[in-house]
């Protein structure tokens, strides 16, 4: 990564959880000149369309790679290469995010974007050369890249781990002095369980950032009183978190906007809203990305009038704290018979049923009403429930036109790299994007 920045190349980390078809799309989208792949993921690569690309493999001993592949060690040089002559707004990394149309869009982040993100992280968490970042998040995630760069620029180190293994992680914290970690559910809970089982107080851990439920954060507070859980809000498109604060400072909020960014809330006509009013969260500043790769129409809309329009809803209170409330209604709206139905409202009603563990609601074509509500649900272990029973249950709790017309029970729901239910992937799988 550092070598690419030095040379002026753009890095495109690919999510190894993608399907082979999705990987092929990403490769086609960016048309790379160089491909570096771990041996275990070669099976995800397309069979065609790689001609002309230099191909290097990780995990292969020198001399063992078969043409056209070479070991990544072939890229190593024993001489110094002068840095490329770049301006700060040239691209450094493309991270593909979910798209409304079901195809991932590549968010282009510049050198300036990532330097700004690194500086604000260093300042907020007071990073020093003594800090050690525990690299358990995958490096196709903007938070993982941000934590790595911030720690490095502060003079600290990152311990890159190939997978999240709680007992091993406890050992690394105790033996290596790990002080910083980014997590998503259920990682923190599993780490605390392992620490309790191993009799560890995780004494060196001081910064935990990510998403989790208040109960788990309370466990952290009790088990590791020296560690602070930080709440934050951000996107790939904002190079990471543009608001953050210790969770206990304002529980439930996403923290305060950082000094390098301006955050506002606007209505559907792009007019600023007063304090406390809910609208779309918009951002401007040096952390806002350069745009989606080869998506001019999307860029014109998303970056209109000098602001990045996040598609997320929220409000800013009188003390400047940002409160995230969900995706923009324009992004998530079902219209059976012209009526407005918001998925979150239906999902809340569904999850009141004691037999349900997870649920996601989408709109699907309907001959009579134009669009209908469809629910995909995961049952709790040992429970049974029919579609008819669930529809009747929900219909008793919200307006009848909002209840699902179709219910499908599934074993699991797809999730994003951030651990959230991937609604767009559900839509794509159902053939309705």
Label every model-predicted segment:
Residues 74-96, 103, 126-132:
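Conserved pre-ATP/AMP-binding loop-to-beta segment of ANL
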Residues 153, 175-183, 192-251, 262, ...:
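Gly/Ser/Thr-rich phosphate-binding loop
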Residues 1-12, 16-20, 29-34, 131-132, ...:
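A short helix-loop-beta submotif of the ANL/AMP-binding
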Residues 9-27, 39-42, 136, 156-175, ...:
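ATP-dependent adenylate-forming carboxylate-activation enzymes
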Residues 18-21, 35, 262, 269, ...:
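AMP-binding/adenylate-forming catalytic core of the ANL superfamily
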Residues 92-116:
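Conserved AMP-binding A3 loop
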Residues 42-88, 195:
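ANL superfamily adenylate-forming
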